Amino acid sequence: AIDGTSAISRLWGTPASYGTALQFAEYCRKYGKTHDMMAPFITNSRHNGLLFPEGYWAQHRPEHLTTEDYLAARWIAKPANLFDNDIPIMVSAAYLFTTPERAKDMQQKPVYILNHASSRATPRSLTPTLEEVEAETAKTGRKLYEGAGITAADLSFENMYDGFTLFHQFH
């Protein structure tokens, strides 16, 4: 038997958009922002996706997204519109982890992982509140930076992909 809210979320998985839409609505209210502020980020993300030849957008749907298209899209769970939600695609990835000593003779230069972290907080309800999300993302960020021995100023780019665009203001 599955107890508590897990009985809902673990059986079929939680509906993707509504929780983040609720959190984003609260974010907009708290900080005086609007859904429209996401348009430059969303259109730039699509543009960048089209620049990646191995990516889905470049291979299967090489179409630009305009600000007008984004702002006019139908609501899925207000304030999350069609373009704030991931599209259903099948994907897989494989990563090989080894030690620096074993990787030293490889043709391809290895990538070093400095740290990893995740958040395993249990929300008070089925959907975490904005305060819970902000606290957990801050905690995860601190773990990542401290474990890697770097700060945000040491980074030259940010590449947090998530097909659900409204997550990004929390990271």
Show which residues each predicted segment covers:
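Short, well-structured alpha-helical segments that form the helix of a local strand-helix-strand
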Residues: 38-45, 155
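A short structural micro-motif
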Residues: 44-48, 161-164
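A short beta-alpha structural unit
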Residues: 116-118, 156-165
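Phosphate/pyrophosphate-binding loops at sites that engage ATP/ADP/AMP, CoA/4′-phosphopantetheine
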Residues: 27-32, 140-154
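Flexible glycine-/small-residue-enriched beta->alpha junction loops
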Residues: 1-31
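Short glycine/threonine-rich loop-to-helix capping motif typified by GTGT followed
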Residues: 125-130, 162-171
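Condensing-enzyme catalytic core mediating Claisen C-C bond formation in acyl metabolism
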Residues: 2, 39-41, 74-143
